[in-house]
Amino acid sequence: MYQDEIKHEIKTLLGERNGILLAHNYMRDEVQEIADITGDSLGLSIEAAKTDASVIVFCGVHFMAESASILAPDKTVLLPRLDAGCPMADMVTVPELQELKARHPGVPVVTYVNSSAAIKAISDICCTSANAVKVVKSLPESEIIFVPDRNLGRYVARFTDKTFHYWDGYCPTHERLKPDAVIRLKQEFPDALFICHPECNPEVEALADHVCSTTGMYDYCRKNPARRFIIGTEAGILYRLKKENPDKEFILASPALVCPNMKLTSLEDILESLRTMTPVVKVPEEIRIPAKQALDRMLAIPRD
């Protein structure tokens, strides 16, 4: 079946099922192209909760579909590739986090949304890469436990005077971006601005003109008068950056910035998922309710 035929059948089935297709910013180009909404993990989950659709086809990785299930329990959440996981989310387990909490009694746990539902359920509050600084500053305590991303935690710590207990997790894709690669590109393209994600390591962030979330990157590149940007995050972001800014040039900071899990989902997978209405991701209520409380506490913090 040709791609155009697959896309047509996907759209037909979405209509028949009262479905909506959500795609993360790191998905393959052709998946982002047919999505009803593209965005970051939390933004998509909020859209899932707001939509009138009864079926959510979530093109992303497992923890994202879980978040959609947490915020939209009355909807059917499909994850076309159940094997699309997140190594960073898997780096922290419930027993390990409970042990860390026991070593630091009374210290609140701030959990990055790139985490499993089970971890969110034993956390005090969640954060995104965009609002992490604001979330941490909102807490009255002088100490926090930050999981699972050490790089995001270190980035946030620069803007607060709190004591951090980091989990030693990281994103393997962002970790592959090394300072040498950035320095070479900055020398080759001296007029280019380098922007990177806070999941990058601190040595890379130190070279950046701007550090921000994926949503922040779209805004920054659209508003900034510069014509050339070096991009320090997963390659999938280039699709929308180029589409929204056809007169600007975007250079991926390293060919290693490709997440294999984000690239698993194909158009064929989406079609098969809609045909069979599987695989369904459903978070059990005993996990969903406390996990939703951690997300709700974050969502209650006023946005800028």
Curated annotation (Swiss-Prot):
Binds 1 [4Fe-4S] cluster per subunit. It comes from Geotalea uraniireducens (strain Rf4). The lineage of its organism: Bacteria, Pseudomonadati, Thermodesulfobacteriota, Desulfuromonadia, Geobacterales. Its EC number is 2.5.1.72. Belongs to the quinolinate synthase family. Type 2 subfamily. Catalyzes the condensation of iminoaspartate with dihydroxyacetone phosphate to form quinolinate. HAMAP family: NadA_type2 (MF_00568). GO terms for biological process: 'de novo' NAD biosynthetic process from L-aspartate. Iminosuccinate binds at H24, S41, Y112, V113, N114, S129, H197, P198, E199, T214. Its main location: cytoplasm. This is Quinolinate synthase.
